[in-house]
Amino acid sequence: MKHFSKGDKDMAFTGKATYSAGANLPELAEDVADLIGIVSPYETPLLDALGDPLREATSTHHEWLEDELLPNKDAVNDSTFTDPDIDTQFVVDNGSRFRVGDQIQIEGSRELMLVMGVNGNSLTVSRGYGGTLPESLADNQVINILGNAALEGDDKPGIRFTNRSRRGNYTQIFTATVEVSGTDIAASHLGLADEMDYQKQERLRELIRDLENTVINGGQPSASPQGGDTARRTMKGVVQHLATNVFRTGDSDFPTGADLDEAKINYALRKIWASSNGNVDLIVVGGFQKRKINSFLSASRSYAGSDTKFTDMVNVYESDFGVCRIVTTRWLPQDTVLLLDSSRIAVLPLAGRSFYFKPLASSGDYECGELIGEYTVELKNEAAHGIIRGLSVS
């Protein structure tokens, strides 16, 4: 048996190694993963939640009709009462909403009144109707019109109706060019089989990402919205459509504080429910507000001794005014929450203009083409949706 001395054991290795030919390892075969990682976000959660449309737009100006029932609310518009406890005449905002025989009631009051006469915006009423006790009237009080009582054998009442309104939005063209040299197409690549196909996929991801961003935040020019030689035609996004149910932190009656909490969500849902037949089923938020929604359960969360999984996530919010799926998107402003009725929203392609690739003639040693898509947003009955703005983001 050979024995080594202490000096033999300390001898450095001097033979051939993987690094002998240089730091770039020129003698070794490359080991490159045959997959390409994409770090940029391209998910479109709102488009996924809305789903594919059942129809297409057939014009660059897509239109739809909206209607509403005759209103059953109004307000007192009179500050000159002689005795607000017994006066039988007062002025309202819209006298045309009332008919003789209407039972009416001031919101928050138990007194019933019967309309005896309507003259322009002036009402004559019978106070304390049905054995109720008269209560004080005041300017700006909301009046609920309960319903009309007709006389037996009476002639038909005057005709009343609503006019349908036409709403619309313009289509917007989304494009991207793909161009690859003949040599690049012929060469062998890591992670892909065809450079042209790969470039199409990447540009398509970008266009769909931009479509969702525009569906949420896009705006429409006040001049030449139909487009022109130098005017680009753009769609109006969801945020820009909303005007009725816009809630901001600091508004009167809106729950105090800048942080998102259940009180603010429920206030907005209740207001939308009270003023429309909208069925809000989507709550759309950014990442920061999603964490705020998750915290709604912090105080009531509990775990059994056998639980080994910690869950801190809310995907569905069930309220008295609807069951809402929580959708988290990167493209919504972080201080904003959208409350949407998905049955009234559609993202429509112009007929034959869903995203597609159009090969273009090549004038050299390359292949080229263009990805094209033309879309618009149909948002019906904007009063059936809502938005909360100005929330804290830190």
Question: What kind of feature is each model-predicted range?
Answer:
Residues 82-89, 101, 137-144, 153-155, ...:
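Glycine-centered loop/turn motifs
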Residues 250-318:
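Long, well-ordered mid-to-C-terminal structural blocks that present hydrophobic/aromatic surfaces
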Residues 103-107, 144, 370:
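Hydrophobic beta-strand signal
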Residues 162-264:
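Alpha-helical scaffold segments that mediate packing/assembly in large oligomeric complexes
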Residues 17-27, 110, 123-182:
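Cys-His-centered catalytic/binding microenvironment captured across papain-like cysteine peptidases
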Residues 3-56, 60, 65-67, 168-169, ...:
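Sequence/fold signature of self-assembling virion shell proteins
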Residues 14-135:
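Autoprocessing Asn-cyclization modules and mimics
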Residues 209-220, 278, 302, 306, ...:
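Intrinsically disordered or highly flexible coil/loop and linker segments, enriched in small
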